[in-house]
Amino acid sequence: MRPRPPAMRTKRRYILARILPYRARVDQKQMYFAVIEAATSLLGDAAAGLAQPAVVFCEGGYVVVRCRRGTEKDVAVALSTVTAVADERIALRTVATSGTIHALRRRMRSIRQLPGDEEVKIGETYFAVYRYPRQKVDLVEKGIKHQKSLFFTEADLEER
């Protein structure tokens, strides 16, 4: 059977989203399950089925989600409702929407952690400091159980 000509194929859109916090390591399959769950809970089974969201790839702090043309706004809203993937708390922030994956790859910027591992004490709790470009600072509580993340800027950290 011959493939369909381009004019008869279903049009697709691709959504580029950034995974926050930057250090989160997420499996593509688990991300797919989280996106489908978010789309189904927000849009319902029928609308999520029509949108056909699928995770194309998930690497380097970014995820690319494929959907049908005309449903990209609904899927982008559903992406913002994702709060956890495989028991790891994350957030997805939509960066761009395009008709090709190649155009989205040009929009991806490598996220590098700045050098300087530190430790800071706030109240009675010790936090590990992770610095990123644009004066972003993540504080992760030291310990085994009940870890929590705090998000600061350079100015907030200097005040402490």
UniProtKB/Swiss-Prot annotation:
It catalyses: Endonucleolytic cleavage of RNA, removing 5'-extranucleotides from tRNA precursor. It is found in: Cytoplasm. The keyword Nuclease applies. The keyword Hydrolase applies. SUPFAM superfamilies: Rnp2-like. Its main location: cytoplasm. GO terms for cellular component: cytoplasm; ribonuclease P complex. GO terms for biological process: tRNA 5'-leader removal. It comes from the Archaea. Its EC number is 3.1.26.5. Keywords: Cytoplasm, Endonuclease, Hydrolase, Nuclease, tRNA processing. One of its GO terms (molecular function) is ribonuclease P activity. Pfam families: RNase_P_Rpp14. Belongs to the eukaryotic/archaeal RNase P protein component 2 family. HAMAP family: RNase_P_2. Part of ribonuclease P, a protein complex that generates mature tRNA molecules by cleaving their 5'-ends. Consists of a catalytic RNA component and at least 4-5 protein subunits. This is Ribonuclease P protein component 2. It comes from Methanoculleus marisnigri (strain ATCC 35101 / DSM 1498 / JR1). The gene is rnp2.
